Amino acid sequence: GVWKAPANVGLADVVEPMVRLDNAHQDDLNVDATTGKSINAIRAFAGKGTLVWGARTLAGNDNEWRYVPVRRFFNMVEESVKKSTYWAVFEPNDANTWVKVRGMIENYLTQKWREGALAGATTKDAFFVRCGLGVTMNAQDILEGRMNVEIGMAVVRPAEFIILKFSHKLQTS
């Protein structure tokens, strides 16, 4: 899945990089001491071919978004969850809708946890989904038709959640 690091992956139909990097050059590119930014080099290795060497983003010292698989997984979850819960925009902004939305997202994330995308021995260690009055919304949100959802996912370490928030505009009361 997208949560697997795209490092050490061979490139098809590539003869060799225009610039050959050795370990010393790679060390200079790997992590800039000041910014934490890394360059994921394309390197040629004898007997292995041409490989993507690294899986870091340019987020540098940001512990949450440092790795490509984390960003790719969050992008996938955000898009999937927004699309799969879009039906809710035609529903009343009430507890019944929130329970259905939470249930759908929890089922989806449970499947991703079983596939190995999330860290943790239990689903409680791997993710949480919040949606409701006094939790992610106040009375004004409900009157204005905003359903706010908060999802915490442990992609790198159990119970260390990175938060994803999104809203849908639902029917107003």
Regions found by a protein language model. Give the residues of each.
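Structured, hydrophobic secondary-structure cores that serve as assembly/anchoring elements
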Residues: 1-173
